[in-house]
Swiss-Prot record:
Residues 174-176 are annotated as: G5. This is Elongation factor Tu. It comes from Anaeromyxobacter dehalogenans (strain 2CP-C). GTP hydrolase that promotes the GTP-dependent binding of aminoacyl-tRNA to the A-site of ribosomes during protein biosynthesis. GTP binds at residues 19-26, 81-85, 136-139. InterPro entries: EF-Tu_GTP-bd, EF-Tu_GTPase, EFTu-like_2, EFTU_2, G_TR_CS, P-loop_NTPase, Small_GTP-bd, T_Tr_GTP-bd_dom.
Length: 396
């Protein structure tokens, strides 16, 4: 069968499989490609091709991730699957693979296990907005009551972490049966049902250009007779010439008007998400704007110093610390384009944090940064990355 060409007309959604080790995440990923390949919506990838995921480096952290793509009648999907638990933790915290929704795989034979809980918590902390459940290996459970009990347990666990446990679609099946070509309701039918649930339940994400304008400032210079120019890559939204923007972070928020947008030395009417631009700012002196601040749509983002974070601490092998750190640890936190010193408060009962750990913590910065939930950052000591984190909650 001829391969369909990549359809740009379909909405694109990023998903991934999460769940406890050996509950069948990779088998399910392979099964999805096999079943959809029959309709020309995927290229079949065997378990081994997915499991031998190449290692990538994201901000100096080694993560093994398999990237698979497939399409349903409605959408095009990019799907990530990680071989090991540590890879999931790193992936979700660094945002290396942003997920618009996740497929939580739970073995019906075992029920929810420690990593099931941990992945749900991580999904909540790092801002994975939707979860669909695949209850796997149901052919190994003869007792229907037991099956209902496992489903109830999964729903309660999701609710415990503020996901709508009662509304979340749970599809029952056997990924292995589907992979072996079984056409029955636990095999192929279950995969189609799962994809229908993913299509319907996980909304198409908002495009970057539809979000409020934000541009991290990378450089500032003055052009004689014209004023101050801030350069950087537009992270989201659109800025039009003549629009008011706020300069947020590091000092008191200032308002200004963008009187010109330049790209590749040409003047434009607007700058869009993904563009590297120079924005000419009215009435601001060169020293009033600096790297580390952001230009943003007025009122869309505010400066903060205190926040809760979910953090992964690099191992020695990844070039991280060789020793643990303790309460009151004061490294630099690298947000977007600059480092800010901050102090760490560990959760009660946690004495120290070892390289390779992931941990929730509270941080207080010495100067405010334009901040919102889900913002990623690096933890550095003298320019060397020793950790990666994500803002789970802004405190003040």
């Amino acid at each position: 069968m001829a391969k369909e060409k990549f359809e740009r007309s379909k909405p694109h959604v990023n998903v991934g499989t999460i769940g406890h080790v050996d509950h069948g995440k990779t088998t399910l990923t392979a099964a999805i490609t096999k079943v959809l390949a029959q309709k020309g919506g995927a290229q079949f990838l065997a378990y081994d091709q997915i499991d031998k995921a190449p290692e990538e480096r994201e901000r100096g952290i080694t993560i093994a991730t398999a990237h698979v793509e497939y399409q349903t009648e409605k959408r095009h999907y990019a799907h990530v699957d990680c071989p090991g638990h540590a890879d999931y933790v790193k992936n979700m915290i660094t945002g290396a693979a942003q997920m618009d929704g996740a497929i939580l795989v739970v073995s019906a034979a075992d029920g929810p296990m420690p990593q099931t809980r941990e992945h749900i918590l991580l999904a909540r902390q790092v801002g994975v907005p939707y979860i669909v459940v695949f209850l796997n290996k149901v052919d190994m459970v003869d007792d229907k009551e037991l099956l209902d009990l496992v489903e109830l347990e999964v729903r309660e666990l999701l609710s415990e972490y503020d996901f709508p446990g009662n509304e979340i679609p749970i599809v029952k099946g056997s990924a292995l049966k589907a992979l072996e070509g079984d056409k029955g309701e636990l095999g192929e039918q279950a995969i189609f049902k799962l994809m229908e649930a993913v299509d319907a339940y996980i909304p198409t994400p908002q495009r970057a250009t539809d979000k409020p304008f934000l541009m991290p400032v990378e450089d500032v210079f003055s052009i004689s007779g014209r004023g101050t120019v801030a350069t950087g890559r537009v992270e989201r939204g659109i800025v039009k010439v003549g629009e008011e923007v706020e300069v947020v972070g590091l000092k008191a928020t200032a308002k200004t008007v963008v009187t010109g947008v330049e790209m590749f030395r040409k003047l434009l009417d607007e700058g869009r998400a993904g563009d590297n631009i120079g924005a000419l700012l009215r009435g601001l002196k060169r020293e009033e704007v600096e790297r580390g601040q952001v230009l943003a749509k007025p009122g869309s983002i505010t400066p903060h110093t205190k926040f809760k974070a979910e953090v992964y601490v690099l191992t020695k092998e990844e070039g991280g610390r060789h020793t643990p750190f303790f309460n009151g640890y004061r490294p630099q936190f690298y947000f977007r384009t600059t480092d800010v010193t901050g102090s760490v408060q560990l959760p009660q009962g946690v004495e120290m944090v070892m390289p390779g750990d992931n941990i929730g913590m509270e941080v207080e910065l010495i100067t405010p940064i334009a901040m919102e939930k889900e913002l990623r950052f690096a933890i550095r000591e003298g320019g060397r990355t020793v950790g990666a984190g994500v803002v789970a909650e802004v405190i003040q």
